Amino acid sequence: MSMSVNEKGICYLPDLGSSFTEDAPRPPVPGEEGDLVSSDGRQYNHSFYSSKSDSLKNEASIATPRRPDLDLGYEPEGSASPTPPYLKWAESLHSLLDDQDGIHLFRTFLKQEECADMLDFWFACSGFRKQEANDGNEKMLKLAKAIYKKYILDNNGIVSRQIKPATKSFIKDCVTKLHIDPAMFDQAQTEIQTMMEENTYPLFLKSDIYLEYTRTGGESPKLFSDQSSVSGNGKVLPGYLPTVIEDVEWRCDQEEEQIAESDPTPSNRLTQKLPLETVPQRVANSKRYQDNREYRHASWREPVNPYYVNSGYALAPATSANDSEQQSMSSDADTLSLTDSSVDGVPPYRYRKPHRREIHESAKVNGRVPLPHIPRTNRIPKDIHVEPEKFAAELISRLEGVLREREAQEKLEERLKRVRLEEEGDDADISTGPSLANHRVPPAVHVQHYGGRYSEMSYNGLQLRDAHEENPESILDEHVQRVMKTPGCQSPGTGRHSPKSRSPDGLPAGKIPGLMMPLSGGQGKHQARQGPKGEAAHLHHHKHIHHTHYAAAGKPKEQAEAEAARMHGGFAWNTEQHHYGPKSRNYADGMSVGPNTMDPMGYSSKGSTLSKRPVRKGEDGRNFEMREPLPADDMERNQKILQWMMEGEKEAGRYKRGPYGSISGPKKAQGHEPARPSSVERLGAVHPWVTAQLRNNVQPSHPFIQDPTMPPNPAPNPLTQLEEARRRLEEERRKSGTLQAKQRHKNMKKQPCENITVAYYFRGEPIPYRTSVKGRIVTLGQFKELLTKKGSYKYYFKKVSYEFDCGVVFEEVREDDAILPIFEEKIIGKVEKVD
């Protein structure tokens, strides 16, 4: 029976005055609902658009349809078009496998990809699980063996490659041991299903086979069997609203003309020209359960059409969807757009909470949309997790650097503080000390050895400064002083000094150069702080005075004056010209510090006794015999040796100056006479010229008047200097070895107080028990107290033994007072049950 277009239109929109079907193309104009149908049943479509025809260009081409499961609470008259089966296939893999057409199409796709065995194996496992127990074990066993041989035994097959080794091993054991269980293939089936859901199933939805099937509308019989045709020509009602062309009014009779003019292709095919007109208004966002790998759909949404997923017209990406949902959650945004509501888009109060809950769920689902990865702008540092050993080594090195910096800063502050204290002490001592007028110095000697500007300098003009360890002169002085302190080369009168007292600058602590010498007669002793490197002119002045009185101790005044005049008048300021005494073989004599040449204090080494005792008769002539000057080659060689020794001492002085105490005060030095000259006492007066002598190889100018009759000193022997340096290095090595031995002995004494680790295996358990016991000696009785389970056991302990090839044995210990053996700083035992 054929129906007219008007009758079809009436059937299509039965009673527009009372209610509206979901397929209504436009909402009616308010107030004109009753004028939609005439008395003869003819529909006047112009009333739908009479008031809005001018605004169609700016409005969407389709209206928001009403679904029966929206928040309206009732189902409108009429029914929605059924969802085609091929669209349900996109919901989940189970939806695809529940349809015969879907299985056939999916198998075709898998054959093209050469992995159809995965689908066959999945169905084989499902059929095996559905086998009833009463079918007999023999039939189940044959079926299990067939599945195992065809799909799992072949390691090159697609199914065998996707199944985990543990699962294959389990199935093999079940088959070989004849333990047939209906669920023995469940794990393998789950793994294959996971593989299909993650790889082959998404590829199938994007494949040309499936997209072509959806474009042609499919040939599934289910689509036609559940609905009857309402038209005489057998055409099916479309599942979606027809396409509405812009700027043209839609009329019901247009559909018949379009159907007649179109090809046999169904009218609900998906076109790429106007995709937005046919896209589902509510796209289902699937949420997959993690336990059974199923999809759950919101009850009020339709599944997404795969055509639009892969055709370039996909919906907004996940980030955009999330932003939209967050905006909806943070405000009462219009998300429904129901134009016929009194309050546009705002749901009633009783539906607001469920609606908000659905929005939250939608936001969570959108966060897992499988779209291309968007790189993060703020990345976690790659080295946030470092190996503990590397981290500890780097941390220790940095902490050691910080510790060295702090120690250097503390030393610098201590040195500055010491200099300030010395300056304050010098001011006090100089102001209260006796004047130079009290010294018994002949005026003639004073005038003879000093110029006008030196004689005018007062005692208060003395400037003392701290010696710097990088200064070559101070390093050389320190080395010479250490050589002179050697026990085998003691000078006469060693009992009157403390040889171990030493300041950080290489000078004897409490010994003040040139200002603490014993005076002749009833004179007192001058006190002053130590000046490591005094100004040359000032130190010359005072040292000469004290030397004169010290050398003249116990002599008549005339004899002392004559000796002083002869000594200081005979300074020969030539390069490496020294005077050796009858027993002179000390390193200091080779370093230009002989008592008759460069040492105005009169101190010398072993063989030089002029400054420490009265000169015996006959010694004078022997000590002052004339010598020939050295040739230029010998002087140059001696200069190189001296410079080499100074550089070596510069490096050694950096590590050997710290452990000694600070400069002693004046009280500590009272009543002590130095038997060895300090560095300033020996070289303080010639520092300004020693460096120039090494650099320029010329005679420096000096304020002293040279005595042409003063004989030059012989050159030092280089072999003697090297032998002395070697002897000093060996002595330092012996001292360091003694300190290391003492440290090791001290550590060995501390070891018995440490704890020891005890580990034991209890009755064959693979994991040992570990504990710690105080002390290094543990007996079997103490070990038994550690056991939580009491009983009759045998005890074996690991020890080193070369009786067997392995090098270790487990020895049984029975006595409670027996000491347990220690193996690699641990006690390792085994506790076995007595049979």
Swiss-Prot record:
Entry GO CC: beta-catenin destruction complex; cytoplasm; nucleus; plasma membrane
Ranges where the record places region Interaction with GSK3B: 351-436
Classification via SUPFAM superfamilies: Regulator of G-protein signaling, RGS, Ubiquitin-like
MF term (GO), any: protein homodimerization activity
Highest taxon of the lineage: Eukaryota
BP GO terms, sorted: cell development; determination of left/right symmetry; dorsal/ventral axis specification; dorsal/ventral pattern formation; embryonic eye morphogenesis; eye development; fin regeneration; forebrain anterior/posterior pattern specification
Cited Pfam families: AXIN1_TNKS_BD, Axin_b-cat_bind, DIX, RGS
The record's account of how the chain is modified after translation: ADP-ribosylated by tankyrase tnks and tnks2. Poly-ADP-ribosylated protein is recognized by rnf146, followed by ubiquitination at 'Lys-48' and subsequent activation of the Wnt signaling pathway.
CDD domains: Axin_TNKS_binding, RGS_Axin
Domain named RGS: residues: 92-214
Biased composition (Basic and acidic residues): 616-627
Keywords attached to this entry: ADP-ribosylation, Cell membrane, Cytoplasm, Developmental protein, Membrane, Nucleus, Phosphoprotein, Ubl conjugation, Wnt signaling pathway
Main location: cytoplasm
Residue ranges occupied by any DIX domain in the UniProt entry: 753-835
Location(s) in or outside the cell: Cytoplasm; Nucleus; Membrane; Cell membrane
Region of interest: Disordered: 16-60, 318-349, 485-530, 602-627
Biased composition (Polar residues): 40-53
Interaction with beta-catenin: region residues: 437-512
Biased composition (Low complexity): 328-344
Annotated domain remarks: The DIX domain mediates interaction with dixdc1.
Role description: Component of the beta-catenin destruction complex required for regulating ctnnb1 levels through phosphorylation and ubiquitination, and modulating Wnt-signaling. Controls dorsoventral patterning via two opposing effects: down-regulates ctnnb1 to inhibit the Wnt signaling pathway and ventralize embryos, but also dorsalizes embryos by activating a Wnt-independent JNK signaling pathway.
Subunit: Homodimer. Interacts with dixdc1. Interacts with hwa; leading to promote the tankyrase-mediated degradation of axin1.
Record-given protein name: Axin-1
Organism: Danio rerio
